[in-house]
């Protein structure tokens, strides 16, 4: 089910989606997982890796962040996973925003306004129905949508979307002001923001422009 939902989301966004062979809720930063991810990164040859920090709320998320860190230094090592050619560069690693403060708060190094992307995000979430129309309504609000029609379930998610006042905290607002000026930044309700990981390469001018439009 989750694989079908992921492919439907990928089709909407026009992206490639590859699912690694680890069960939902059971991922650990094991040697097997590290080498699988290392081979995958080498095959894709990404300029930038987006991931969550290793202090995220979900154990799978924490493990993923740790695995990316564990892979970073060894991506160029020819003796590690010698069946895949090593990278001759280190990708940029960016963490997306989270609200957690332990061991330290998220630091927004770059941000971009995302108010115009809300409808696309809504459509993506609708395609991940088992998450956004089944599990999260129950986990967050104890709302059971089982037995409801698809239209009723989407209407619930739409109401949640429209009631959302925004995701721009003080640190992200300050980042937006530095980049775009206060007049523009203070009108932004929703934004994407990223923290640069010290385990990856520094952000160059081309990527900075791609992320911010500046």
Region spans (language model):
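Active-site rim/loop-helix segments in enzyme catalytic domains that contact anionic ligands
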Residues: 1-44, 74, 195, 203, ...
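Divalent metal-coordination and catalytic microenvironments
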Residues: 6, 17, 49, 68, ...
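Active-site environment of divalent metal-dependent phosphoester hydrolases
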Residues: 24-26, 55-61, 101-103
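Proline-aspartate-enriched helix->loop->beta-strand connector
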Residues: 33, 37-55, 59, 64
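Short Gly/Thr/Asp-enriched flexible loops that form oxyanion-binding sites at enzyme active sites
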Residues: 59-75
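Short mixed-charge
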Residues: 75-89
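C-terminal accessory domains and tails appended to enzymatic cores
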Residues: 81-82, 103-104, 110-214
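A structural motif
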Residues: 87-103
């Amino acid at each position: 089910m989750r694989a079908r939902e992921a492919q439907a989301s990928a089709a909407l966004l026009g992206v490639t989606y590859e699912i690694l062979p680890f069960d939902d809720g059971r991922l650990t930063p094991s040697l097997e997982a590290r080498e699988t991810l290392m081979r995958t990164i080498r095959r894709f040859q990404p300029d930038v890796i987006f991931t969550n920090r290793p202090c995220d709320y979900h154990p799978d998320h924490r493990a993923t962040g740790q695995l990316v860190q564990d892979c970073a230094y060894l991506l160029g090592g020819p003796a590690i996973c010698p069946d895949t050619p090593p990278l001759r560069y280190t990708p940029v690693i960016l963490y997306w925003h989270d609200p957690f403060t332990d061991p330290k708060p998220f630091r927004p190094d770059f941000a971009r306004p995302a108010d115009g992307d809300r409808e696309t995000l809504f459509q993506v979430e609708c395609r991940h129905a088992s998450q956004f129309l089944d599990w999260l309504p129950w986990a967050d609000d104890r709302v059971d949508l089982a037995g409801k029609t698809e239209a009723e379930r989407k209407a619930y998610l739409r109401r949640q979307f429209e009631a959302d006042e925004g995701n721009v905290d003080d640190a992200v607002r300050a980042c937006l002001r530095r980049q775009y000026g206060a007049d523009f930044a203070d009108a932004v309700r929703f934004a994407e923001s990223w923290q640069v990981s010290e385990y990856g390469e520094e952000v160059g001018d081309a990527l900075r422009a791609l992320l911010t439009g500046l």
